[in-house]
Curated annotation (Swiss-Prot):
The keyword Lipoprotein does not apply. Its EC number is 1.2.1.44. This is Cinnamoyl-CoA reductase 1. It catalyses: (E)-cinnamaldehyde + NADP(+) + CoA = (E)-cinnamoyl-CoA + NADPH + H(+). SUPFAM superfamilies: NAD(P)-binding Rossmann-fold domains.
Amino acid sequence: MPVDVASPAGKTVCVTGAGGYIASWIVKILLERGYTVKGTVRNPDDPKNTHLRELEGGKERLILCKADLQDYEALKAAIDGCDGVFHTASPVTDDPEQMVEPAVNGAKFVINAAAEAKVKRVVITSSIGAVYMDPNRDPEAVVDESCWSDLDFCKNTKNWYCYGKMVAEQAAWETAKEKGVDLVVLNPVLVLGPPLQPTINASLYHVLKYLTGSAKTYANLTQAYVDVRDVALAHVLVYEAPSASGRYLLAESARHRGEVVEILAKLFPEYPLPTKCKDEKNPRAKPYKFTNQKIKDLGLEFTSTKQSLYDTVKSLQEKGHLAPPPPPPSASQESVENGIKIGS
C-alpha cells in the first residue's frame, strides 16, 4: 500500500538506534521537516545521546525511548502510535553470535511491531554487504538492486557482517510479506561524511587511520562511497514517495583506496598519509560498476566523495578526534581550486 505523507507536520515516526551515525542525520532531517520523532536508544540518559536533544526541534518533538533490539515489548511500545518506522539499529561486529541472530530478530521484531501498530511504511537500513559479495559475478557486470550476495561465500570466508546483513534483510522481506507491511530497503556502501554523534564509528575510522599515520600503507582494494547526509535524506525520500518500493542502492562513486589517499593528500597535505600500496605485486584492483539511477529518480543528488572526505576530516578536527595541523599558507586557495565547498 503506497504511503501518503503529504504533510509531515503532526505525523509521528520511529527511528531505531537513533543515536547512530546514519540515524542521527535521519532524526535531524525528520525534525527539520516537522515530524515528531520517537527514537529508540539503549539509555535515554546516556550523554552520548545529548546531540539528539540539541537538534533543532528536538526539545519539542523528539522523544527518546529506552528499547533494546532484542526486547520486543519495548520496541512495540516505541512504534505504537507511529505512522512510519526507520529501522537503522543493527549490530556491527564480526562475531557471528553477536551479529547474525540479533540482526535477524531485530528486523523481525520491528516488522511485527509495525504490523500491530498498523504503520504505513517501514524503511530499513541494510547494506551493500547484502548486495555485492558474490565471487561468481562477472567483474564487468553492473551491480544494481537485483543483486544479492552469495551466502555460502560470506559464511565460508567468515564475513559475518555481510552474512548477517543479508539474512536480516531476507527475514525482513519475508516477514513484511507475511504481515502485509509496506517495506522499503536501502543498501548503502561505505558511508563517509561529518558525524553528529560524539563517538567514532567503523566507517569513520577508515579515514582516520590514514590521517593519524597508524596505517603505513593502503590496501589494493576498491570500495564504493556515499555521504551520510545523502543516505539519511534517501531514507526520508523513500518514506515520503508513494511510488517508492523494493531496494535502493546508495553509492556515489567506487574508488581504489589509493585514489582516496591521493584525494586526502591533496586536501590535507600536512598529515602523514601513506604513499605505498600494501600489495605492489598484483595489478591495481579495478572499481566495480554500479547504478544509482533508482534513487536519483526520487530526486536525490549525491555529494561528491571529494567533498564528503573534506567535510569528514574537518568534522573530526572540530570534534577533537583529529589534531588540526597548522594550515599551509595556500591551503584555503588550494581547497577552493579543488572544487571543495569551504564551511559547508
